[in-house]
């Protein structure tokens, strides 16, 4: 079966879970054509992402004249479908902060994608994220292209669900996917009750084969913590220097490694200096998947101080690497992190509670940390094997294709 995947920006370092899902579908024998509106080749550091770039069709590279021509052609040859798509784009644009003009651009993008899906013989479109990628997928369907489904991740979609017309997108789709039960509950808030059966839970996943049996915990030196993610307001990294300083004031010996980059890097560096913890912090920048696994192997635990989340891939990766997780008790985190079993949960935004858990982790014997890591590894392998989750997605697509 030939299907299309549609994203706004792909590939990029923060959506490696999409790549893993696509590859898992291809291992099942499916042919997947990648569409993205754009991608930044210069920003890619992982060789696997570079390879994906070469396999991805970038819609905006077609240029404005070609997109406009595709829209005009469909307006003339499929006037009823074009009228439906135009009405949807106008309606959605009226709700959105991006406005109706931007949605006319989405309509032109959809016309181009509809033409390409027909030329490629694609029978279904799956969009990731409930943002403009799902909008374009819905418009492609209106224009006479294949049916569509989409995956909602959060937290961004849940910040502006009405502006994104999430309820309308669920109603128009063959099915909608949430990556956690928390995500499904949030999507259900904006979908009509009659459409709730369309909303299914399929987890993002890891490739178990890439995570061999964990090595031993670091035997000497301070408690080694690592945090991984984009330096953005929702990830809460600004809280870490304060919590680190509090823990050190109590005599806790620890070191923190921050993996990632982003718009808040300067503020994070300033907070590190302000709290006097520069000697206990390492910033690595972005690392590829192999680099992330090396950092996890050199740590005792992952810390994730997020203010908003979906269901973080870094939690899955840390657990697969046999490392306990300190995470905020928000969104999908409690679906993975079991307090006292696979890690610890902390109220979001509470630096003092974070410092308490740093002290708790530092006082926990290495053998117990390793035991918690093994429990986490078993849990994530059972719940987040990407081949198993992709097979569930494939069955939903197959069901959607039945008359």
Locations of the language-model features?
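Conserved acidic donor-binding segment of nucleotide-sugar-dependent glycosyltransferases
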Residues: 339-340, 344-351, 360-366
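Short hydrophobic beta-strand element within catalytic cores of glycosyltransferases
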Residues: 324-327, 337
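Carbohydrate-associated surface elements
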Residues: 182, 205
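Short alpha-helical donor nucleotide-sugar binding micro-motif in glycosyltransferases
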Residues: 170, 286-287, 294-299
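Nucleotide-activated donor-binding/catalytic signature segment of Leloir-type glycosyltransferases, i.e.
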Residues: 269-287
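Aromatic "clamp/platform" in nucleotide-sugar-dependent glycosyltransferases that forms part
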Residues: 307
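Conserved donor-binding/catalytic core segment of Leloir-type glycosyltransferases
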Residues: 217-244, 257
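A short, well-ordered alpha-helix in the C-terminal region of glycosyltransferases
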Residues: 360, 368-382, 389-394
């Amino acid at each position: 079966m030939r299907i299309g995947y549609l994203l706004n920006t792909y590939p990029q370092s923060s959506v490696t879970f999409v790549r893993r899902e696509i590859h898992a579908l291809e291992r099942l024998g499916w042919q997947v054509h990648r569409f993205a509106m754009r991608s930044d080749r210069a920003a890619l550091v992982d060789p696997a992402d570079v390879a994906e770039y070469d396999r991805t069709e970038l819609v905006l590279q077609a240029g404005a004249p070609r997109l406009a021509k595709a829209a005009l052609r469909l307006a003339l040859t499929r006037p009823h479908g074009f009228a439906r798509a135009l009405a949807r784009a106008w309606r959605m644009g009226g709700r959105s902060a991006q406005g109706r003009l931007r949605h006319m651009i989405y309509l032109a993008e959809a016309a181009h994608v509809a033409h390409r899906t027909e030329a490629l013989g694609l029978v279904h479109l799956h969009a990731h994220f409930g943002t403009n990628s799902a909008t374009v997928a819905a418009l492609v369907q209106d224009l006479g292209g294949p049916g569509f489904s989409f995956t909602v991740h959060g937290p961004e979609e849940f910040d502006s669900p009405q502006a994104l017309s999430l309820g309308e997108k669920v109603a128009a789709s063959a099915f909608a996917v949430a990556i956690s039960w928390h995500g499904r509950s949030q999507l259900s808030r904006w979908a009509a009750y009659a459409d709730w059966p369309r909303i299914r839970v399929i987890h993002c996943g890891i490739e178990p084969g890439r995570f061999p049996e964990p090595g031993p915990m670091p035997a000497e030196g301070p408690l080694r913590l690592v945090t991984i993610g984009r330096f953005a307001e929702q990830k809460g990294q600004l809280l870490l220097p304060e919590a680190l300083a509090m823990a050190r004031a109590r005599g806790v010996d620890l070191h923190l490694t921050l993996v990632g980059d982003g718009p808040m890097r300067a503020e994070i560096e300033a907070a590190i200096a302000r709290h006097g913890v520069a000697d206990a912090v390492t910033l690595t920048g972005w690392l590829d998947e192999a680099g992330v696994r090396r950092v996890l192997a050199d740590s005792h635990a992952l810390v994730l101080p997020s203010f908003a989340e979906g269901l973080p891939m870094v939690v899955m990766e840390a657990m697969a690497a046999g490392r306990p997780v300190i995470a905020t008790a928000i969104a999908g985190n409690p679906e993975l992190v079991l307090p006292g079993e696979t890690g610890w949960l902390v109220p979001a935004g509470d630096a003092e509670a974070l410092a308490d858990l740093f002290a708790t982790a530092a006082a926990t014997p290495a053998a117990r940390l390793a035991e918690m890591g093994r429990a986490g590894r078993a849990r994530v392998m059972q719940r987040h094997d990407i081949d198993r989750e992709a097979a569930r997605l494939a069955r939903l697509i197959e069901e959607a294709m039945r008359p």
